[in-house]
């Protein structure tokens, strides 16, 4: 045979050489930050007005959060983590 230039075998077709990346990973915030200030309590302390609570004094604070925040809607209470 003669010394003719050899044809090299065709290069195998390869896909992209960059490795495939998964979805981005998100870090969860440790503290909850609110854009607005939490609501203030509307009613503080009932004293002896509550039936069955006589004798506890007049310096007691609200027992039930829905009584303290009765002027707000449920979604507003949930927004600030009150309920």
Curated annotation (Swiss-Prot):
GO biological process, one term: positive regulation of G protein-coupled receptor signaling pathway
UniProt source species: Rattus norvegicus (Rat)
Lineage of origin: Eukaryota, Metazoa, Chordata, Craniata, Vertebrata
Gene3D superfamilies per record: Retinal cGMP phosphodiesterase, gamma subunit
Keyword Manganese: no
Top-level lineage group: Eukaryota
Region (Disordered): 1-51
Entry's family note: Belongs to the rod/cone cGMP-PDE gamma subunit family.
Reaction equation(s) it catalyzes: 3',5'-cyclic GMP + H2O = GMP + H(+)
One GO MF term: 3',5'-cyclic-GMP phosphodiesterase activity
Domain note: The C-terminal region is important in conferring inhibition.
Entry function: Participates in processes of transmission and amplification of the visual signal. cGMP-PDEs are the effector molecules in G-protein-mediated phototransduction in vertebrate rods and cones.
Keyword Hydrolase belongs to the record: yes
Record protein name field: Retinal cone rhodopsin-sensitive cGMP 3',5'-cyclic phosphodiesterase subunit gamma
EC number: 3.1.4.35
Residue ranges, compositional bias (Basic residues): 22-43
Record key words, sorted: cGMP, Hydrolase, Sensory transduction, Vision
EC category: hydrolase
Any one cellular-component term (Gene Ontology): photoreceptor outer segment membrane
Self-association and partners: Tetramer composed of two catalytic chains (alpha and beta), and two inhibitory chains (gamma).
Coiled-coil region: none
């Amino acid at each position: 045979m003669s010394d003719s230039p050899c044809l090299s075998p065709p290069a195998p077709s390869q896909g992209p050489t960059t490795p495939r990346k998964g979805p981005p990973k998100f870090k969860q915030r440790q503290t909850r930050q609110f854009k607005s200030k939490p609501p203030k309590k509307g009613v503080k302390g009932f004293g002896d007005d509550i039936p069955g609570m006589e004798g506890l004094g007049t310096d007691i604070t609200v027992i039930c959060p829905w009584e303290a925040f009765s002027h707000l809607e449920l979604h507003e209470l949930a927004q600030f983590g009150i309920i």
